[in-house]
A protein has these predicted regions:
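C-terminal engagement/docking regions of AAA+ P-loop ATPases
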Residues: 1, 232-314
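Pre-Walker A (pre-P-loop) alpha-helix and adjacent loop at the N terminus of AAA/AAA+ ATPase modules
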Residues: 2-46
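Conserved alpha-helical scaffold flanking the Walker A/P-loop in AAA+ ATPase domains
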Residues: 27-30, 83-103
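Walker A/P-loop
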Residues: 32-69
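Walker B catalytic acidic pair
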Residues: 42, 105-106, 117
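P-loop (Walker A) phosphate-binding loop of NTP-binding proteins
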Residues: 43, 77, 145
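Canonical AAA+ ATPase core
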Residues: 84-89, 110, 114, 122-198, ...
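Conserved AAA+ ATPase small/helical "lid" subdomain
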Residues: 193-248
């Protein structure tokens, strides 16, 4: 199965439960193929949870969901040791993090200590329960939803955690035709149940094909040029880390696969960078007051960055 067919199967299945959102579904698929984590931000009611839950259903993988609240404890996510009366010994009760796809709903409703419980899993694909490190199933993908910081009762995510999210996707209000189509489907009762359409062997094959995507030295230079510009911009308190460069590399290869190419082009890099960079930079307060946003800075950088030599399929 080629990349476009792979994407089409997911989009067709997802159309049973959501109207529009093709760009978001594509980004979720890129993150899946890159084994990256995704943060979806938006006010309540924009179908964040619906999108993530049903996207997970399209794969033949294990899935767990945890609704995060101010009193959620790290052990509620990772698990605990307990004494078993049956075996007369201590055993581990694994938490919901031991799954292929974890939906962390309203991640910024819970305190930083609990949020940080997911850091090890996001980076090392393992979790430590009472000093014992246990590998998570592979792939492990965290899909988290969050409310805007202007909402009541929310916490900022730690910078270390934000850095581990490959994409941050902001959901906007639906367009007129999309909302009307959604209302019509609700009225007619025509939304359908989403099924698994990508079995594990097909997903494994897709992972392998992504790893075969070629990337030239010129494209690597282009990626470095982009991240360097975030580090030297006087309007920023700090730029992005080398982990971000890796995320751009992985996501660009996944996008090339979905476009049925066996090599990365600059447009692949530019397209994924918009969603990878935006949450990993910090504006100085003076520029925030002036109304400049992270998105403004990233768009400016991507417009200025150039590839010094034309790349090709070689």
């Amino acid at each position: 199965m080629d990349g476009k067919e792979f994407l089409s199967k997911i989009e067709t299945e997802m159309s049973k439960c959501v109207v529009g959102k093709e760009d978001i579904i594509k980004l979720l698929l890129i993150s899946m193929l890159s084994k990256g984590h995704v943060l979806l931000e938006g006010i309540p009611g924009l179908a964040k949870t619906t999108i993530v839950k049903n996207f997970a259903k399209t794969f033949g993988l294990s899935f767990s969901r945890i609704q995060l609240t101010p009193d959620t404890m790290p052990s509620d996510i990772i698990g605990v040791y307990y004494y078993s009366e049956k075996t007369k010994d201590f055993a581990i009760k694994k938490g919901p993090i031991f799954t292929n796809i974890l939906l962390a709903d309203e991640i910024n409703r819970t305190p930083p200590k609990t949020q940080s419980a997911m850091l090890e899993a996001m980076q090392e694909c393992q979790a430590t329960v009472e000093g014992t490190s246990i590998k998570l199933p592979e792939p492990f993908i965290l899909l988290a939803t969050m409310n805007p910081l202007e909402s009541e009762g929310v916490y900022s995510l730690p910078e270390a955690q934000m850095d581990r999210f490959m994409f941050k996707i902001t959901l906007e209000y639906p367009k007129k035709d999309e909302e009307i189509a959604m209302l019509k489907k609700k009225y007619e009762g025509s939304f359908e149940t989403v099924n698994s359409v990508i079995p594990p062997e097909e997903l494994k094959e897709a992972f392998e094909k992504v790893l075969e995507i070629k990337i030239s030295d010129e494209i690597l230079e282009y990626i470095y040029e982009i991240v360097k510009m975030t580090r030297t911009d006087d309007r920023l308190l700090y730029g992005v880390s080398p982990r971000t460069s890796e995320q751009i590399l992985y996501a660009s290869r996944a996008l090339a696969f979905l476009n049925n190419r066996n090599y990365v082009i600059p447009d692949d890099v530019k397209e994924v960078s918009k969603y990878i960079l935006v949450h990993k930079i910090k504006l100085k307060i003076d520029y925030e007051i002036e109304g400049i946003s992270n998105k403004n800075i990233i768009n400016e950088i991507l417009d200025k960055a150039v590839v010094f030599k034309k790349t090709g399929d070689n």
